[in-house]
Amino acid sequence: MLYTNDLQGTVDFYTQTLGFTCKSISKELDWASLTFGDIDIMVSLPNEHIPFDKANFTGSFYFLTNNADIFWEQLKDKTSICYPIEDFEYGMREFAIYDNNGYLLQFGHELAF
């Protein structure tokens, strides 16, 4: 579950920018379910008993793709970039962006050697 202070903005970012489909949204429960292929993500406003000002996840969400370059071309001019696409010595070609909440999203594919 990803917490957000802007449920509709997050649904819009994931659907309009990243290409997810909104499977379900409940304004009463302040919750939404999003899907992209085999990926399912749930987002919600934080519960009252959970202190939350902004995204504070200390890691990243890694999307392993068949071709990160395709996603890079689609996203590079529409998102906040953490680092541009590049090849890494550990055998991955990847890039990273921030979503509308500040969560770090990485996209990569394995390099053929």
Residue locations for each model-derived region?
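Conserved active-site tyrosine of GNAT-family acetyltransferases
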Residues: 10, 14-15, 75, 99-102
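Vicinal oxygen chelate
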Residues: 21-64, 72-98, 109-113
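Short, conserved charged micro-motifs
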Residues: 9, 68-72
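Residue-level preference for alpha-helix termini and adjacent loops
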Residues: 6, 12, 87-91
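N-terminal beta-strand motif that seeds the catalytic metal site of vicinal oxygen chelate
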Residues: 1-11, 59-61, 111-113
